[in-house]
């Protein structure tokens, strides 16, 4: 099991999701549905709190099992929920995975997704031993 990271570049911070994140993550996702629907299979017009709560529950379990690492993307200064980044489909033989991310629409154009991807990739390389 990997310990909970707090990864930051002083602009954003990545951390594990907690049950208390349900409302903030739901608000970020709902705000961004128009942008997310074409790209994220989970995004749909009725996406809401119950699905977010289930997501947070499941990613807690898959984190503990070492199968899927989802991280909250937050503002490093005030903790505002900005989106999510994940390492999935981890291949233990070849030491690689998929990296996915999204950031809330109201913060688009500030380089947050690139920052989140960079921090998550470093987590994969340094903590998970991926190539």
Regions found by a protein language model. Name each.
Residues 1-106:
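GNAT-family acyltransferases
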Residues 131:
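Short acidic/polar active-site loop segments enriched in Thr and Asp
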């Amino acid at each position: 099991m990997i310990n909970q990271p707090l990864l930051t570049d002083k602009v954003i911070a990545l951390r594990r999701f907690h049950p208390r994140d349900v409302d903030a993550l739901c608000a970020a996702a709902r705000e961004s549905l128009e942008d997310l629907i074409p790209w994220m299979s989970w995004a749909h017009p009725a996406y809401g709190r119950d699905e977010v709560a289930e997501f947070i529950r499941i990613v807690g379990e898959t984190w503990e099992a070492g199968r899927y690492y989802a991280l909250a993307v937050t503002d490093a200064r005030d903790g505002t929920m900005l989106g999510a980044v994940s390492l999935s489909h981890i291949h233990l033989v070849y030491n690689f995975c998929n990296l996915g991310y999204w950031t809330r629409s109201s913060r688009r154009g500030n380089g947050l997704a690139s920052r989140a991807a960079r921090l998550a990739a470093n987590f994969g390389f340094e903590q998970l031993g991926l190539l």
